[in-house]
A protein has these predicted regions:
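Bacterial N-terminal signal peptides that target proteins for export
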Residues: 1-6
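Short beta-strand elements bearing conserved aromatic residues within extracellular beta-rich modules
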Residues: 58-60
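Short Pro-Gly-centered beta-turn/loop motif in secreted/extracellular proteins
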Residues: 75-101
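Structured interaction patches on ligand/partner-binding surfaces of diverse proteins
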Residues: 74-77, 98-142
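Short amphipathic, basic-aromatic surface patches that mediate peripheral association
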Residues: 28-51
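N-terminal Sec signal peptide cleavage junction
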Residues: 17-20
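Short, acidic Ser/Thr/Gly-rich low-complexity loop/linker segments typical of extracellular
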Residues: 63-80
Length: 147
């Protein structure tokens, strides 16, 4: 091999790769109404229904062997990927909707139970598509999402 070839190969190795020290999480989400009498079986982040306000963000929570963290994305993105921020280890991963004023009241939605996954440095854990069920009807009789 010539010196030029070796030099080019070394440049590519040093500039083309970035060291990572943790794992990442990828997920997508859909919002469903708690009441099945609505004609549409999915709702937008801003449902436009009386007594509700928009879900502005979706937050991912993690606890990896006692080390906790979060990441959030705009609800309308319908998809999110963290950086390689999670430490290696056994992770509990959960999600929750957020309103403009802060976290949504837990009485106004149902999120999937926390999932246990193994985080490996340099790898991405996929939660796949998750659904959150939101209270968006009968808001005069019960609390609704982000009211």
């Amino acid at each position: 091999m010539s010196r030029v070839t070796i030099a080019i190969a070394l440049c590519l190795v040093h500039t083309g790769c970035e060291a990572v020290s943790g794992g990442a999480v990828e997920l997508s989400w859909k919002l469903r109404p708690a009441s099945s009498d609505l004609p549409d079986k999915f709702v937008d982040c801003a449902s436009g229904l009386d007594g509700t306000n928009p879900v502005t963000r979706v937050r991912l929570f993690w606890d990896v062997d006692g080390q906790q963290g979060t990441a959030s994305w705009r609800c309308d993105d319908n998809h999110g990927v963290t950086g390689f921020d999670l430490p290696e280890g056994s992770a509990l991963l959960s999600i929750a909707p957020e309103c403009a004023e802060g976290p949504a009241s837990t009485s106004t939605y149902t999120a999937p139970p926390a999932e246990k996954r193994r985080v490996i440095s340099g790898d991405t854990v996929s939660l796949g598509a998750v659904e959150m069920i939101l209270r968006v009807s009968y808001c005069g009789q019960q609390p609704c999402i982000c009211e």
